[in-house]
Amino acid sequence: MGRLLGQAALIVLLAAPALAAPRDTMSLDTGWQVRLDPADAGAIKAHPREARWLPASVPGSVQQDLIAAHRVPDPFIGTNEGAIQWVGLSDWQFRTSLTVTSAMLARDHLDLVFDGLDTFATVRVNGTVLLTGDNAHRRWRADAKALLKPGANEVLVTIASPIRHLQPMVLAEKNPLPGEYDSAFGDEPKGKQTSPYIRKPKYQYGWDWGPRIVTIGLWRPARLEAWDDARLDRFRVAQEALTDTEARLTAHATVVADRAEAVTIRAIVTTPDGRTLTAERQASVAAGRNDVSVPLSITQPQRWQPVGYGAQPLYTVAATLAAKGEVVDQARRQIGLRTVTLDRKDGAFGFVVNGTPIFAKGANLIPFDSFPARVTAQTMQSLLTAARDVNMNMIRVWGGGYYLDDSFYEMADRMGLMVWQDFMFGGAVTPPDAAFRENVRVEADEQVARLGDHPSIVIWTGNNEVLSGWENWSDRKAYKKAIGPDGQERIGTGMAVLFDRVLRGAVTANSPGTPYMPGSPSSDYEGPVDTDANGDRHFWDVWSGSKPVENYLDSCPRFMSEYGFQSMPAMATIRGFAGKGPLAADSAVMKAHQKFLAGEGNARLQFYIDQRLRPAKDFADFVYLTQVNQAQAIDLAARHHRACRPVTMGSLYWQLNDVWPSISWASVDYDGRWKLLHYAARRFFAAQAIVAEHKDGATRVTLVSDATTPTPARWRLTVRDMAGAVLSTREEAATLAPLSAATVATLPDATLFGDAAPAQSYAVAELFVGDRRVSRVLVDRLAPKDMALPDPGIVTTWSGDSVTLTARNLARDVMLDVGAFTGGQPSDNGFDLLPGESVTVRLPAAARKTLTIRTLAR
């Protein structure tokens, strides 16, 4: 524990340029080699070539190294996943040479720092053990000075197979803890998973959207840090109070010192418009860890706002640590000033930012890649930009992966995207022992301290589906029966302590202005979990439960944090992993890249096509129809959630992205190509939207506005037949109240459609602000397959990198399918065209050769 300092001198003055110099740091990210651990005789016998050293990447994984050396095939291609499984079942060694000078050895400390060891690692320096690690989510540091010598030094990191390391213990358990997904490769017996017992990204053990690639390696940067006297171990900035006239902050510095001495902490604040303020505190520190705080005050603060509600001004807070009159360390934070609360009154679940109730619109983010070390800033930037560009304002970082790099949250800060941050628990029941909780406590304390200053993070949640699974899932109920009342009490109490005390305590200590919930879904122990009445919901009756998509209309949850519907990725993405041969949904390669129901999920795609749409003409048309089904399902659900405001205050669909090229719930596939769902999100998440729901023989029209001021508008409902004739029109003026959803009409079929045949007629609901149509949706009384859709008669006209589509008749769900073209994607897609209507889409002219126009017409 740190030592909290008492009274100390506080000096506030006009800032001068910071003269801080960082501690000396030497990167250890180059020169690494990897081989099988000589002690792993079985692996060496099976793979003798890998007993010799080969080049390794840090940050990275041994799987990446073997792929680069062509020792194993790329698991993302074809059916290669099985061929890489032996790697995660073997023990490995990594080594590098570290050159140390006499000047370096003259420093007080030479710390080896590993930002990520994956996972059961032993670090030796010149043959002597320096440290052992057992948590991939933690940073590991140890002073290596006593083991180093002038000249070349060997750093050797031995990492055990996480599965084999834990398997003897798990196999000896009469009732092992329930995990997530059983292995499809026979390396773990069914129901005897090792993943619940390890602190490592859980998705790497396989999920219903991703492969089983149990990575091993130094997955984040490594370095040597030289320092004297004292160093800054942590630096964060807490917001104590915020008004329109003043922001009161506290800069918290954790100082690690060799001995008792006087130090000076200086904090320099740079405002968004370039003004500076400096505060300085002199204090006496003791040997060990010390907490030093520096109060700060900012007048006329500029508030950070979520996208769509204002700007995102950011402040820079730089800190220097001086000892013996010399600057010995420095740190820097970028912060935003905002208040956030979670409205929980009477079971509600809604975010209030700077006093404004925000309807959360967005999606769930899974890890960017099976190999996190190769994720680039550009990849993250592109995906977050894609989210913002379709009117999302929130991203949920799902709990089965890893805590993302600082750059991700910095991007979210700049874009105004709110982040829902799970702690990294993906669904498995957690061990009840105190040692496991202590390991997690250190992890959580470190991660919240690292990330807690980001204004984009508006909630921390303790886990994904651990608590709801414990309460509701059939396999958990069977487990509880097997272990009896005493076992249930022991396991249940352990989870309650972990999620309600340990993790909540980490947030309270390091980010006290950010709400916390013990899980998702959660009612915060106020009652049953995963209900419409209290807390957030994960709704999977549609898709996983094979229920009709219209079931989305049956309830108004308080916050829908998960719901989803699968589709195929783009044809170009499919060709990338399946090759040039014939394609079929039930082929080995397509089933290998479909993880739902162990590869049988493609039958679920066909089930919903049969239920709702026309038959596919060929495989490419099948791909199109799956994307139409996905877009229509999520459009229906998201608009319904928005129409349920203020009962419902958020809609986050599953999922935004893919971890590998696959058939999944993603709206943006692994190669960054937008599915029709992502284009649809731009429409159903628009700031002002019209919702027209047909249910029980009537159409309900609701107008939705996210604006903070009243908006004059008008809405129109037009009934047409398939020949294009207008059968009736209703139009009314309306004022959209701020932050609202208002039902303006409920019209029985006889009133709206008269005697028009359901298969031969449809309604067009439109919302106008001024002369601009801001939202449109079509209303059918039958499933699309039962509508008498005419030949749309679409004509295309090219002009440079733009193509204009003109429809002679109604065209539903128009897709510009560019096939195998990889040079760009349409600016819009998946839209409807009314008779005689034209739309111009930006698309590289080179796509003309492969372009196919698809619609729902037979």
Question: Model-found features: residue ranges?
Answer:
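Active-site-adjacent substrate/metal-binding segments within catalytic domains
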Residues: 65-100, 104-114, 118-126, 131-134, ...
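Substrate-binding/catalytic cleft of secreted carbohydrate-active enzymes
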Residues: 394-414, 418-592, 629, 633, ...
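Accessory beta-strand-rich segments of carbohydrate-active enzymes
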Residues: 35-39, 69, 89-231, 394, ...
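Short glycine/proline/serine/threonine-rich loop/turn segments at secondary-structure transition edges
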Residues: 104-108, 148-152, 165-166, 299-314, ...
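Carbohydrate-binding surfaces of carbohydrate-active enzymes
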Residues: 253, 586-828, 833-844, 848-850
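Extended acidic/polar, glycine-enriched regions
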Residues: 146-154, 252-344
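Extended carbohydrate-recognition surfaces in non-catalytic/accessory domains of CAZymes
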Residues: 21-113, 192-221, 225-230, 345, ...
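Short acidic/polar inter-strand loop motif in beta-rich domains
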Residues: 160-167, 322-328, 768-775
